[in-house]
Amino acid sequence: MREILHIQGGQCGNQIGSKFWEVVCDEHGIDPTGRYVGTSDLQLERVNVYYNEASCGRFVPRAVLMDLEPGTMDSVRTGPYGQIFRPDNFVFGQSGAGNNWAKGHYTEGAELIDSVLDVVRKEAENCDCLQGFQVCHSLGGGTGSGMGTLLISKIREEYPDRMMLTFSVFPSPKVSDTVVEPYNATLSVHQLVENADECMVLDNEALYDICFRTLKLTTPSFGDLNHLISATMSGVTCCLRFPGQLNSDLRKLAVNLIPFPRLHFFMVGFAPLTSRGSQMYRSLTVPELTQQMWDSKNMMCAADPRHGRYLTASAMFRGKMSTKEVDEQMINVQNKNSSYFVEWIPNNVKSSVCDIAPRGLSMASTFIGNSTSIQEMFRRVSEQFTAMFRRKAFLHWYTGEGMDEMEFTEAESNMNDLVAEYQQYQDATADEEEELYEDEDDADLQE
């Protein structure tokens, strides 16, 4: 049944990924040794989306873990769920990519990629009907961005008709880990535009803000941020893993969210977000969830949806609720805020309802939006890129690994084209669209 193969790369990807497996194991009632300790048959019904059942009745995640240095892998292995993974699926080098995209994509990463692909192939052959791949990585470093995009393009070659979903952590506007982030991110986006089907865009600053403002955590750790991400990741695929009244899968999601093939970078949000202390005092309603999930403060990337318009959006609800109420709320949102939706795509919000809520909540919702305001992120990275590239700063680290300046120029213009496309559809009105069609019709007639 519709399996998803999970791949995590680099330090960031491995940390998010291991948090994600903690959440999914908890939802399916699987303990750190891979044994089922749950109470409900529903947990086992479609457990095989993310797990392989071994002969001894243990469940092994369909996960591939890769990195160019052993450090993060060791901490995953010694972490709470470290023993659940298949030992052969840890693939790591020794040298590290040193935040250098070229090392991850062309030199160090290229040497390791074949052994990663062998593991991916093995896992894919174990699947009954593979639905697609989900990749966790960051775009600012060297391994997740360079080697991550290399792996995505190789998988694309070998499995062209399978969905490719990525959870990509973009460099944040104010929090920077490395100076060369804009280079690494731009080179990665250049690849993701061509080779990924759906990219969920995350960034640390927006996640910090959520922890700080909404969850009232005074000193949020990466663990807290990753917990937010993993709640969203689990929400995106809950329809595949649990029975629901309105199902959605990765492909349905893509068909409903991507009006133009290049514009597949989504904002994600999750509700309810309440600070840990006040959680028990709230009873949730569908209108409350809806209000929170459409709130710009809830978005996990630093772009404000009020500065653009939604091309499409998807709302995934979990818990016991009436679908009628969900539909009413969605229509309500569109009617009240019609200026924030493009008018040339009618009914552009897809909703799905899954019956099983996450642990500790009566209902929850995951939001995925394709908004033109995401161009703010690309624009910001692009400006930083141009500032450095104009001076050819730090370029020798990349050319030294065999890269050509031409590649940088191409990546830069691809990113700028993407921004221009988002802007074009933000400004488009229904009348203009009609004019375009009429022009095309005239052209047909003249032929």
Curated annotation (Swiss-Prot):
It is found in: Cytoplasm, Cytoskeleton. It holds the Pfam family Tubulin_C. GTP binds at residues 11, 69, 138, 142-144, 204, 226. One of its GO terms (cellular component) is microtubule. GO terms for biological process: microtubule cytoskeleton organization; mitotic cell cycle. Disulfide bonds: none annotated. Keywords: Cytoplasm, Cytoskeleton, GTP-binding, Magnesium, Metal-binding, Microtubule, Nucleotide-binding. Gene3D superfamilies: Helix hairpin bin, Tubulin/FtsZ, C-terminal domain, Tubulin/FtsZ, GTPase domain. Mg(2+) binds at residue 69. PROSITE patterns: TUBULIN, TUBULIN_B_AUTOREG. GO terms for molecular function: GTP binding; GTPase activity; metal ion binding; structural constituent of cytoskeleton. CDD domains: beta_tubulin. Its cofactor is Mg(2+). Belongs to the tubulin family. PANTHER family: TUBULIN. Tubulin is the major constituent of microtubules, a cylinder consisting of laterally associated linear protofilaments composed of alpha- and beta-tubulin heterodimers. Microtubules grow by the addition of GTP-tubulin dimers to the microtubule end, where a stabilizing cap forms. Below the cap, tubulin dimers are in GDP-bound state, owing to GTPase activity of alpha-tubulin. Dimer of alpha and beta chains. A typical microtubule is a hollow water-filled tube with an outer diameter of 25 nm and an inner diameter of 15 nM. Alpha-beta heterodimers associate head-to-tail to form protofilaments running lengthwise along the microtubule wall with the beta-tubulin subunit facing the microtubule plus end conferring a structural polarity. Microtubules usually have 13 protofilaments but different protofilament numbers can be found in some organisms and specialized cells. This is Tubulin beta-5 chain. It comes from Triticum aestivum. The gene is TUBB5.
